[in-house]
Amino acid sequence: MTDAATLSTAGFDLTPPTEAERERLEANLTAEEARVLLHHGTEAPFCGGLLGEKSPGVYGCRLCGLPLFKHETKFESGTGWPSFYAPFAEDHVVGVRDTSYGMVRIETRCARCDSHQGHVFPDGPAPTRLRYCINSVSLQFVKAGAPLPDPLHRGDKIT
């Protein structure tokens, strides 16, 4: 953790990457990952690699590794994108008003690195009635029991 770390309610370091760290992380992205994560793109529906993933585990930010969603909150929405009814921790995902394409929506971003993840809609299942509609390419799946990726060397662990 950094000296002046901002910890999430789940104990993860939310300190944004430095400019040098961000450049290093961005250099490892594919063109499609960069288009979605950095330029607020959307992958085509029904083609994402994590859409059918049903294994126990955690879905983390593809850019910085912060855990964003738990497998227990994933559900089949029929929209063509992985959908979740709650984030890993409320303060791991940030909502930003998005008025692009003549619509009013809430864009979801990683609270640590500010990368685009998808959108949240008020049409999900109980208990939250929310649907976090997330691009597969924005996420990396970590099977239960496997160590979390730690590209920023923050020492974050699920306890």
From Swiss-Prot:
Gene3D superfamilies reported in the protein's UniProt record: Peptide methionine sulfoxide reductase (2.170.150.20)
One function term, GO molecular function aspect: peptide-methionine (R)-S-oxide reductase activity
Residues where Zn(2+) binds: 61, 64, 110, 113
Co-factor binding comment: Binds 1 zinc ion per subunit. The zinc ion is important for the structural integrity of the protein.
Classification via PROSITE patterns: MSRB (PS51790)
Active site residues per record: 133 (nucleophile)
Source taxon at top rank: Bacteria
Annotated InterPro entries: Met_Sox_Rdtase_MsrB, Met_Sox_Rdtase_MsrB_dom, Mss4-like_sf
NCBIfam families assigned to the protein according to its UniProt record, in alphabetical order: peptide-methionine (R)-S-oxide reductase MsrB
Protein name as it appears in the record: Peptide methionine sulfoxide reductase MsrB
Gene that produces this protein: msrB
